[in-house]
Regions:
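Bilobed "Venus flytrap"/periplasmic-binding protein-like clamshell domains
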Residues: 21-44, 102-164, 168-170, 270
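A structural signal for short loop-to-beta-strand junctions that line the ligand-binding cleft
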Residues: 25-26, 88-96, 119
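A local structural motif
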Residues: 46-57, 137-149, 285-291
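Beta->alpha turn/N-cap motifs
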Residues: 59-61, 70-83, 149-150, 167-173
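Hydrophobic residues within well-ordered alpha-helices
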Residues: 67-68, 157-158, 279
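Hydrophobic/proline-rich hinge and linker segments of small-molecule sensing/allosteric domains
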Residues: 91-112, 191-207
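Pocket-lining segment of extracytoplasmic ligand-binding domains
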Residues: 148-239
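Secondary-structure end/capping motifs
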Residues: 210-278
Length: 295
């Protein structure tokens, strides 16, 4: 298996293997099934012409912060974090998470009319989920927001530590088990309001480390192999699936790995422009340059 373990925790200074003249690149993405499914071939040396990758698995709030420091050559981040990163990184047109029917949820234990004046747990300050929630709740904001590890959000809401919790990914398949209900599906809200898919996670390539065109080619080949040979990545995906049931893993991949993962296309870029344009207009992010397709 051609995967090097991380040499240090995210946030610590990592030794750059290229300093020793090695053809190694640093990549970071989440242990979620959509990411491990997409990147399996790439990080296992199955993509011709690609370098060997040193892999870090981390939640997106961690990779958002690490990308600000330029720690990785190829990295999965929230689209909400992209405006702070484009001086160093290039947005790639593939490998990310964008689609319909896959948006974040605001969950509650007890019926609430809104989150106005409430205490809400969120997975990160620069996550797309939180940005969407802020846009949705512009006129009725919560009184308090706490950044909480994703795995602790649903248990915390169920225990009454928070009035509401903002969740993503597999939580949409499992929140009922915690006795919770959805106050709002932010993806449905976004799609109804804009007619566009919801941009969640982006793939960025560090401009001074990788050729973005080459990186795009590698990722597209990794996706092609994932779709053509899904059994090849099965053990790897399940290993990192955080005790997720196989049926939930399959639902997760089916929802988040789609045509937009292979190529953002016209609708994908329009969705990203709409999200970041609205965020800038609301004073929530810096402006971004034109994000026209790279290739």
């Amino acid at each position: 298996m051609n995967v090097a373990p991380p040499t240090s925790a995210p946030g610590e200074r990592q030794r750059d293997p290229r300093e020793a003249g090695l053809n190694v690149a640093r990549i970071a993405f989440s242990p979620c099934p959509n990411d491990t499914f997409v990147f399996h071939a790439l990080v296992h040396g199955l993509v011709p012409g690609a370098p060997r990758f040193e892999v870090t698995y981390a939640d997106v709030d961690v990779t958002n912060t690490a990308a600000e420091r330029g720690e990785y050559d190829l990295v999965k981040v929230s689209y909400a974090a992209v405006p702070w990163l484009l001086d160093r990184y290039q947005l790639l047109p593939c490998g990310g998470a964008l689609g319909r029917g896959c948006g974040p949820l605001v969950l509650v234990r007890d019926p609430l009319p809104s989150i106005e004046g409430r205490h809400v747990a969120v997975p990160g300050e620069r996550t797309t989920a939180y940005l969407l929630m802020r846009l949705w709740a512009t006129n009725a904001p919560p009184a308090r927001v706490s950044v909480v590890p994703f795995a602790d959000i649903m248990p915390g809401v169920a225990a009454g530590h928070y009035d509401a919790g903002l969740v993503i990914h597999e939580a949409r398949f499992t929140y009922h088990r915690h006795g919770l209900r959805a106050l709002v599906d932010l993806g449905e809200w976004w799609e109804s309001d804009t007619g566009l898919p919801i941009p969640l996670g982006a793939i960025l390539a560090r401009k001074d480390a990788l050729d973005p065109v080459a990186a795009t080619t590698w990722i597209k080949e990794s996706i092609r192999q994932a779709w053509e040979h899904p059994d090849a990545s099965r053990a790897y995906v399940l290993e990192h699936a955080q005790e997720m049931e196989p049926a939930v893993v399959d639902q997760h991949i089916a929802l988040y790995v789609n045509a937009f993962t292979e190529d953002l296309g016209t609708d994908g870029y329009a969705a990203v422009d709409a999200l970041l344009g609205r965020a800038y207009a609301a004073g929530l992010t810096p402006p971004v340059p034109d994000l026209a397709p790279m290739i």
